[in-house]
Structures are given as C-alpha cells and as structure tokens.
Amino acid sequence: MKLNRSEFQDYIHSYETDEIFYRDLYLAEKEHPETFMKYCQELDHELIASRKLYVPALSKEAWYPYVEENDMFHDFTGNIMLCKHYRYSPVFTHEHEFFEILCIYNGTAHTTIQGISHTLSTGDICIIPPHTKHNIGIFDDSIAINILVRTSTF
C-alpha cells in the first residue's frame, strides 16, 4: 500500500474497527467495573471469534503466548511488515520468532520486556529480539508502529 503524507496521517490517526471495539471494552471496564462482566457476556461472541479479538474476561487461557513467524507473515512475501499497534488492546505477554521494532510515533506506551517495565515516549524506538517475553499497553490516543522483521532477513 502506497500512501502520500496526508493519507498516512489520516490512516495513522483514524481508529480501526478493532481499535474501537477495544476502546469500548476498556472504557466499559474503567467506567463501570460493577457491570463489566455482564457487558462482556453480552458481546457478540461470533464477532470476537471471527476477528480473533482478545477479551481477557471471557478467556480462560493465555492469548497467543507464542507467535511463529509463519503465522504472522503467512500471506506476506516481504521480509519487513509495518503495522499500527492497536490502541486500547488488552495487554498480553507474548513472544515470537521474529524481530519487533516498536516505534512511538506520538504519545506514550507502557511496555514490559523480560519482566522490566519501561515507558516509551514520542520518538522512542525499542528493538525486541526473537524469543523475548514482552507486552505493550496504549490506553489513550497515542500511536505506535510495529515494524516486524523476519529472522531470516539477517
């Protein structure tokens, strides 16, 4: 996908459908903790399954604790993939076979890598090597870009 500067700005700041789902989930828990479980039970479970969304309150096991390179790059022929990190997505600790370069485009993100917590701010870059346990949390309008790199690239 090729974007000019204006199109990139629109894309990076707009909310994807899944981000809206996660934002609503986050706000429901934060603003109405007493009714949050009922809210979760009334969610569209077919939509959650079809979009592969993660709702910790509905899950009894870890969500994708290990991601293989072929799972992430299954329909992608290149070696480097860029994707926006979904704002408000639940924090889940995981590791994977590929490199992840986390770039904070705007705002802040909270990450834990191998048990050590970090706060990253605009302009910060964090390189996460394969087989490293980590997580990331963004619970506002901050923007982070993930650069995923196949291990075979090096």
Language-model features and meaning:
Residues M1-Y105:
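Generic protein-terminus/edge-of-domain signal
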